[in-house]
């Protein structure tokens, strides 16, 4: 009787396996598919295809069998909902794919569960606004505190940049153009008081770097040209040349 039961189970399982990993006459994947790691019964993935295109939910696994990723295909706009996992089961990231590339809003987490960033993607590149968070506040105070607020264009920093102290006060602000610092940048202390200003051209300091005390008095001024700091002698020569040629010095 036991032998008969075992035989029936074997036939049933064999029948299930025979229905998996099928292709049609044109070689296109159809129906349920799964793949295992070499020399192992542990699945790499399992899901379903229709005319060679993934449909429904696909699950992917680590070599130890823990869930690595879950992707739900067939959402409006040609998108797929994605959840990626650490090997301890915590969510690593969740967002969307479009044509197998990151798209729209993605949330990223620490292995201990804290939200670390919220980023926008287009064609697998960072595009638009992105927020980055302090981990400590979520652990100690259950508070979500922004560390940086930035913007991207085609994977490069582009637009307004702001960073913050843990207490929420502005720490630094300026602008990027395609990954390079440009224009006026300002720095503040943890009380929110301006303590420094500087200008950049194509990621190089170019102009006066000025530091202030908390009362707003100038502590120091240093001139940079194309990233090079001018010594007192070089500064004197530069200003004399500008005056002689009736040229306005850089600001």
Predicted regions mapped to residue ranges:
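Bacterial Sec-dependent N-terminal signal peptides
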Residues: 1-21
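Glycine/tyrosine- and acidic-biased, solvent-exposed loop/turn segments at the edges of beta-strands
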Residues: 16-251
């Amino acid at each position: 009787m036991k032998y008969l039961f075992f035989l029936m189970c074997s036939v049933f399982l064999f029948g299930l396996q025979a229905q998996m990993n099928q292709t049609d006459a044109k070689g296109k994947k159809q129906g349920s598919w799964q793949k295992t790691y070499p020399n192992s019964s542990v699945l790499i993935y399992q899901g379903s295809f229709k005319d060679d295109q993934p449909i429904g939910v696909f699950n992917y696994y680590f070599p130890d069998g823990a869930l690595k990723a879950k992707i739900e295909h067939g959402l409006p706009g040609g998108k797929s909902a994605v959840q990626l996992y650490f090997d301890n089961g915590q969510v690593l990231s969740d967002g969307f794919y479009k044509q197998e590339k990151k798209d729209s809003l993605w949330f990223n987490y620490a292995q201990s569960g804290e939200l670390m960033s919220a980023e926008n993607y287009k064609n697998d590149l960072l595009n638009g606004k992105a927020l980055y968070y302090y981990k400590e506040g979520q652990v100690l105070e259950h508070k979500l505190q922004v560390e940086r607020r930035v913007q991207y264009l085609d994977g490069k920093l582009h637009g307004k940049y702001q960073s913050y102290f843990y207490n929420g006060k502005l720490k630094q602000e300026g602008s990027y153009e395609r990954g390079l610092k440009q224009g006026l940048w300002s720095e503040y202390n943890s009380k929110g008081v301006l303590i420094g200003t500087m200008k950049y051209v194509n990621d190089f300091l170019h102009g006066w770097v000025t530091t202030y005390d908390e009362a707003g008095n100038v502590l120091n001024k240093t001139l940079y040209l194309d990233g090079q700091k001018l010594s007192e002698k070089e500064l004197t020569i530069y200003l004399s040349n500008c005056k002689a040629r009736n040229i306005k010095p850089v600001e």
